[in-house]
Regions:
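Transmembrane-helix motifs of polytopic, lipid-linked glycan transferases
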Residues: 97, 101-117
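Short hydrophobic/aromatic helix or loop-helix immediately within or flanking a transmembrane segment
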Residues: 52, 67-93
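Membrane-interface alpha helices of multi-pass inner-membrane proteins
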Residues: 28-29, 131-135, 152-157, 164-179, ...
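Specific aromatic-rich, kink-prone transmembrane helix
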Residues: 109, 131-134, 146-163, 188-195
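Membrane-interface transmembrane helices that cradle and orient dolichyl/undecaprenyl
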Residues: 152-165, 271-281
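Transmembrane catalytic cores of multi-pass membrane glycosyltransferases
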Residues: 41, 53, 179-278, 308, ...
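C-terminal luminal/periplasmic domains and tails of membrane-associated envelope-modifying transferases
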Residues: 358-400, 404-411, 416-626
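Transmembrane-helix signature of polytopic, membrane-embedded enzymes
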Residues: 23, 110-133, 149
């Protein structure tokens, strides 16, 4: 058949297969957009945005804590907080929809860059899905998405003749949205440097426009409330030996090829990137950028998304080389109908990837694990007529308290080293773990109240003091304690006097009744709470524990299944609840089976916890349920 005779049929088929593949790429990539992590950063960003909207000014000093109050605060993401607070204030879930929109645009740019180098939508699709899967755990609602998006934008426009003219306005915006602008400057600087080296080697005109663009972009980044001092924020992480470096996102990436784990997906991106390098089609710039970012990602897992996006063109070349080899062996798969069938199959797979991904209802709560925050204790604090002024709080809850209990100074939050010094970080970890000398640190900071996880060491230590701290509010997530001395003690009110009869109050009531052994009262309160808020995950955990104490195996299984119906992919907390409940019943086999279902492949699973679970499974004396 001649080319002219098949064109009327093949051209529409090619367009159709390409359109279906593009749709499949975006649908499939978006399925990875909802990680199961406690997105603690969003709350302080929203609190900052709220402050700016309400006061009409950008705070240059910290207005939220009692440990750094009045100290200089470089809020490099103030504009993100301003935008997202406006969305959140209209409706909380608008922040989730806005983040999803940014991610779809990000994946579209990654796919476009991958297609441009590979000229294959199949290769571009495989690359984009692999990139999305490797980024999955890091895609919570926070400003770093802007850096990923703008990095993809730079990579997709670098070869535009007038691209350098776009850089100054882009970096003026970027420097007010996220400190990752410094990476972007490094990216365009690397590009200009390699262009210069090639020009000198080949005796061609120097890339003056590129260097003018780099210099103007660096200057434009200074257009922000802190001027060129904004550069201090990214530069302080180059040699990061602060106690904040103990945070798990700054730890090195593990070695694994298991695609179910964050590390396995990262190393598979590395593998396809290497295939792309060996294809002989890679540019020196793409190789150099991948080399820089892979070192960053290996040294700190938080940089995995930057590497994946930066290496996407090379990975696409790798997939393209594999597809080319397959076509040479099986020429028939290159014809139009097999391509159309492959496109349809890709769309079907993309739809199946959404299995178990429940975006509705309450997408923001699902995206941030919102039910894990101390909403009841925060409401109690906000309702107090004379709240504490020197609260010691759990690190990951500081931003939440800034938003939900405004006006109550906090001890620390996830603004980390952009505000708090290393000494405070060391004090925090010592106090939280009730290490030697914690009492002196409490006195030095004037702590008059504590809000920490219920099972934390410091909560137990405070209740064992000679003058025990008084519990104002407690539920499975958190405990709020007040110092034994001082006028605050006499003014403490029962939660029922300050809080409405909502799911939080009923959860607290059920939790306390269960601990006292009053199982009927606990069950009644928890069932009422579950009817009121079926998305409060900790209610299901408490109902499992009540069933365990009643030795009701069927009821325990029922509430496990109910929790999985609400949160099909919130495996770890649900199976952790089930494991503890079965263990309390003395049901070794069921406990072991639940323990085996806990997934340990995420980047925010501490090595100690991973090793403990694996050791318990390995040393168990019973066999799993068949």
């Amino acid at each position: 058949m001649t080319k002219s005779s098949r064109t009327p049929i093949s051209q529409p088929l090619q367009h159709a297969s390409s359109a279906i593949l593009v749709l499949a790429i975006l649908v499939g990539a978006a399925s990875w957009s909802q990680p199961h992590v406690d997105g603690s950063d969003i709350w302080w960003h929203l609190a900052s945005g709220q402050f700016i909207w309400q006061n009409g000014e950008i705070p240059l000093d910290d207005p939220f804590s009692h440990t750094a109050n009045g100290d200089r605060w470089t809020n490099h993401s103030w504009l993100w907080g301003w935008f997202f607070w406006a969305a959140y204030d209209g409706h909380a879930d608008m922040a989730a929809w806005l983040n999803l929109t940014l991610l779809v645009v990000l994946f579209a740019l990654v796919a476009w860059s991958a297609w441009r180098v590979s000229r294959s939508w199949l290769a571009a699709g495989a690359t984009t899905w692999l990139v999305a899967a490797s980024c999955h755990w890091f895609l919570d609602v926070r400003p770093q998405i802007v850096t990923l998006l703008f990095t993809a934008l730079l990579l997709s426009t670098l070869d535009w003749r007038r691209a350098p003219w776009l850089w100054p306005p882009l970096f003026a915006l970027w420097a007010n949205l996220h400190a990752g602008f410094a990476f972007g400057l490094g990216l365009i600087g690397l590009c200009a440097l390699l262009q210069t080296e090639q020009a000198v080697r080949c005796r061609q005109p120097l890339p003056r426009a590129a260097w003018v663009g780099v210099v103007c972009a660096a200057l434009a980044a200074g257009i922000n409330p802190w001027g060129f001092a904004i550069y201090e924020v990214p530069l302080q992480h180059i040699y990061y030996e602060s106690p904040f470096g103990a945070l798990i996102e700054w730890q090195a990436t593990a070695a694994s090829l298991d695609p179910r784990t964050y590390a396995g997906r990262f190393w598979w991106v590395v593998a396809f990137t290497l295939v792309g390098v060996l294809s002989g089609k890679a540019t020196r710039f793409s190789i150099a950028l991948a080399a820089v970012t892979v070192i960053m990602a290996i040294s700190a897992r938080r940089f995995i998304p930057l590497f994946a996006i930066s290496a996407a063109p090379l990975a696409a070349l790798g997939f393209g080389a594999i597809l080319d080899a397959a076509r040479r062996r099986l020429p028939a798969i290159s014809s139009d109908w097999p391509r159309l069938v492959a496109s349809g199959a890709a769309l079907l797979v993309a739809i199946l990837l959404w299995n178990g991904v429940h975006f509705l209802p309450r997408p923001l709560q699902r995206w941030t694990s919102g039910e894990s925050y101390p909403s009841g204790a925060a409401a109690y604090l906000a309702a107090m007529p004379d709240p504490p002024q020197h609260l010691f709080n759990y690190y990951g809850w500081g931003g939440y308290l800034m938003l939900q209990a405004p006006g109550i100074p906090i001890f620390i939050d996830s603004r980390a080293s952009t505000l708090y010094d290393d000494g405070l970080a060391a004090d925090y970890f010592s106090m939280l773990n009730a290490e030697q000398g914690w009492q002196e640190k409490f006195e030095a900071h004037g702590v008059d109240a504590v809000l920490v996880p219920t099972q934390s060491r410091i909560a137990a230590a405070l209740r064992k003091q000679r003058l025990a701290w008084r519990v104002a509010y407690v539920d499975p997530r958190s405990v709020l304690l007040f110092a034994p001395a001082g006028p605050a003690r006499t003014r403490l009110a029962a939660p029922a006097r300050l809080l409405p009869e909502d799911a939080d109050l009923l959860l607290s009531r059920g939790f306390q009744s269960r601990r006292r052994g009053n199982l009927d009262r606990a069950n009644t309160a928890l069932l009422a709470a579950q009817r009121m808020d079926p998305m409060q995950l900790f209610i299901y955990g408490e109902l499992m524990f009540v069933a365990s104490l009643r030795e009701d195996a069927d009821e325990l299984r029922h509430w496990t299944e109910e929790a999985l119906q609400v949160y099909p992919r919130r495996w770890n907390p649900i199976w952790s609840f089930a494991e503890q409940a079965w263990d309390a019943m003395g049901r070794c086999e069921e406990s072991l089976e639940a323990l085996r279902k806990i997934r340990l492949g995420g980047p925010f699973i501490a090595d100690e916890l991973r090793n403990e679970v694996q050791t318990r499974i390995r040393e168990s004396q019973c066999s799993p349920v068949r």
